[in-house]
Amino acid sequence: MSKTDKELKYYLERGFSGKQLEEIKKGIESGIDIGIYTKKGFGAKAMYYIRKSLEKELDIKPYASTSYSWKQIQQIVFGLEKNLDVTFYASHKISWEKMREIRLQLEKECNV
């Protein structure tokens, strides 16, 4: 059994779903710190966005919290990809729709 298979078995035994295990496997294969997103409260979509941001070396760690929905994490990642100051909207108390609105406004201001 390979090291990757052993790690996946560990997460399978802890109740992670097939899609979550796929994200874990992709993270292991890309050599990122999977510990940032292998928390039980993250669904596969949140894990996907966190994994992709880690692979791009974006500073997602402060926002890798299960208090955010996957759509909120998505908006934070989109902002980080554009080099925006996501602290303006990175709050679990702000809906993802409002986050999107703020992010788009920040993008517009950066393009002026």
Model-predicted segments: where are they?
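General marker for long, soluble alpha-helical cores
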Residues: 1-112
